[in-house]
From Swiss-Prot:
It holds the Pfam family ASL_C2. Its EC number is 4.3.2.1. Its main location: cytoplasm. GO terms for molecular function: argininosuccinate lyase activity. This is Argininosuccinate lyase. GO terms for biological process: arginine biosynthetic process via ornithine; L-arginine biosynthetic process. It is found in: Cytoplasm. Belongs to the lyase 1 family. Argininosuccinate lyase subfamily. Pathway: Amino-acid biosynthesis; L-arginine biosynthesis; L-arginine from L-ornithine and carbamoyl phosphate: step 3/3. It comes from the Bacteria.
Amino acid sequence: MKLWGGRFKEEESKLMEDFNSSLSFDKKLYYEDIKGSIAHVKMLTNQNIIKEEEKEKILLGLEEILKEIDEGILKIEGDYEDIHSFVEINLINKIGNVGKKLHTGRSRNDQVALDMKLYAKKSTEEVIECLKELMDSLIKVGNENNYIMPGYTHLQRAQVVTFRYHLLAYFEMFKRDEKRLENALEILNESPLGSGALAGSTYNIDKEYTAKLLGFRKPVDNFLDGVSDRDYIIELISKFSIIMMHLSRLSEELILWSSSEFRFIQIGDAYSTGSSIMPQKKNPDGAELIRGKIGRVYGDLISILTVMKSLPLAYNKDMQEDKEPFFDAKDTVISCLKVMEGIISTLKVNKENLMKSVKKGFLNATEAADYLVNKGMAFRDAHKVIGEVVIYCEDKNSAIEDLSLEELKQFSDLFCEDIYEFIDYKNSINKGIKKEMGYF
């Protein structure tokens, strides 16, 4: 049974039926589809479009279908065109002809637009919750490991920071991601139900009622836009892509830091794997997979952008292709956030190796230049002097703080005994605006 066919003389080919069907993936929307239908039926009764007793039968049937799906009694499978057909046909089979009144004053166009918006809202809230859990772990692990470490530019050791402060940089990234998603929720929070196929309905549909009942801020203002808007899907996948980019940056650093060349951290066994041939190997596969899965989400974004390119108003069947990219992007970003939270919450930090790397990289060179500036030298001249000091140290295989005062005075008479206190790593990180890094 189809929800259409009266104007056709010939049957749809089996090839076209299979090609046209979306049940295999839009079955994810069963909950939203049934909840939308419940709201629609209540509105139809309020507007005296269907009778009270008809409403009760339809509602009971819909609730039974929802319960049977949730309990695994009713399988979402079979020769149905989509989830809307599945629900409506099963409703008719369950309660009889009164079920045929469910779709009064509604099109699958505004129905699927509603389903996707409800699903997008729920999915976005899930992603926000995962972001919050990861941010909490970043703060907790950072506070537990507030150790001095090298900060990098160009992947070269640059200046002293702390492990805590480094993690807090990612906290800020994910905090922006959270704000972006909250803003997206506000924009998409308009109900398309009542838009019909593209031009509303001759029935006195109360779209404000259904919008409120379903938790939307308001109904859409334009019917054509209501059924054809997929901006929110593009926007959300775009924001998911930014989250994945942030996760990939963090993953890359964790992979580097856990390597034998760095040994800054140890990723827990629970988020590592081994080798089938090399017994000694402990691979950071969790972080590597997160880094790799960014390609999926970027691909999902390009997919939906391409689907929507040049589409005329209003609904077009191309829009059926909006679902799989969104479902995939949402599932991917949630799984990656959860795995990253697990990696962060269980990693171990090697305080000693962090400090060893600090001492090998002339990370107090900028502070040494600042010292000369405080003694009256212009910064550009101080920069040149300390550059020469670094060359001298490299030739001696020494650190700036290990040079004698006599050696330092070869480069400038401004050097005094207090230079050593000034360029001490623990002291320098608590000077000036550096205090904001919160080393304690």
